[in-house]
Amino acid sequence: MKSDLETPLNLEELAFSHISVLGREVIEGLAVRPGGHYLDVTVGGGGHSRLILEAAADVRVTAVDQDEDALVAANKNLAEYSDRIQFIYSNFADYEFPPNTFDGILADLGVSSYHLDQAERGFSFRQAANLDMRMDRGRSLTAADVINNWDEAELADIFFKYGEERLSRRIARRIVERRPLHTTTELADAIASSVPPKYRYGRIHPATRVFQALRIVVNDELKSLETFLDKAPNALVPGGRIAIISFHSLEDRPVKHGLRNSPLLKVLTKKPIIAQEEEISNNPRSRSAKLRIAEKLV
């Protein structure tokens, strides 16, 4: 197996399993063919890559992820396909896309259930952990750096821009009053204490949008997505397809416009493909998923 992955992590300690969102729709959308070469730029635990490898004979996959834990888990989960898969440790924005190479490219955006379940990664406000939120732990900026060092106006701006949080100024003011904040639960408590009771006990936890904003900033997600959308189409062979799954409007809007505005692509999904009720009942995360597909012009 070709691999750029060299890490001493214990495979048995990992719980990186991933239920593939819109799996059938992705395989149909990519039109996986025998002998094809496919690029999965967010391999995670390997769920979608497995479906691609199983969809036709002699398929090859190049699997990219910026999280070393994910690559270790995918390496283990897909060991039976070791002669047909190559793992690369990289953010998809930094990946050097070889021109006219792939029959299909897949990106499954956003945070995985693994990241939310692993308290020490700092993505979830439901368990106490250090304010980290780095997908790639080689990055220097953490959520704690942002929360404790950025000024009130900057915090309010990112909460509004990347979390679409209407109470961004009020929340930023309370955070500045209470900092330094070191853990996810300390931050969540500060946020909850800054909002009206009806907001505090609503269906969505008041920290949800702030945590989304911090994750986007720490991982530079939207800039990375913009770079990916610019670079990826050239890596497709003529007639090759790109499939992108997004989970909120801040992701879906640039995907929609990026695919539509690329001179190399023809959009195949007039409206995004969404999960059916059966999938939603089995995997609630799929409720907000939107799949868009485009094909490279000949």
Swiss-Prot record:
GO terms for cellular component: cytoplasm. It comes from the Bacteria. Specifically methylates the N4 position of cytidine in position 1402 (C1402) of 16S rRNA. It is found in: Cytoplasm. Gene3D superfamilies: Putative methyltransferase TM0872, insert domain, Vaccinia Virus protein VP39. Keywords: Cytoplasm, Methyltransferase, rRNA processing, S-adenosyl-L-methionine, Transferase. Its main location: cytoplasm. HAMAP family: 16SrRNA_methyltr_H. S-adenosyl-L-methionine binds at G46, G47, H48, D65, F92, D108, H115. This is Ribosomal RNA small subunit methyltransferase H. Its EC number is 2.1.1.199. The gene is rsmH. GO terms for biological process: rRNA base methylation. Belongs to the methyltransferase superfamily. RsmH family. InterPro entries: RsmH (IPR002903), SAM-dep_MeTrfase_MraW_recog (IPR023397), SAM-dependent_MTases_sf (IPR029063). NCBIfam families: 16S rRNA (cytosine(1402)-N(4))-methyltransferase RsmH. One of its GO terms (molecular function) is rRNA (cytosine-N4-)-methyltransferase activity. It catalyses: cytidine(1402) in 16S rRNA + S-adenosyl-L-methionine = N(4)-methylcytidine(1402) in 16S rRNA + S-adenosyl-L-homocysteine + H(+). It comes from Nostoc punctiforme (strain ATCC 29133 / PCC 73102).
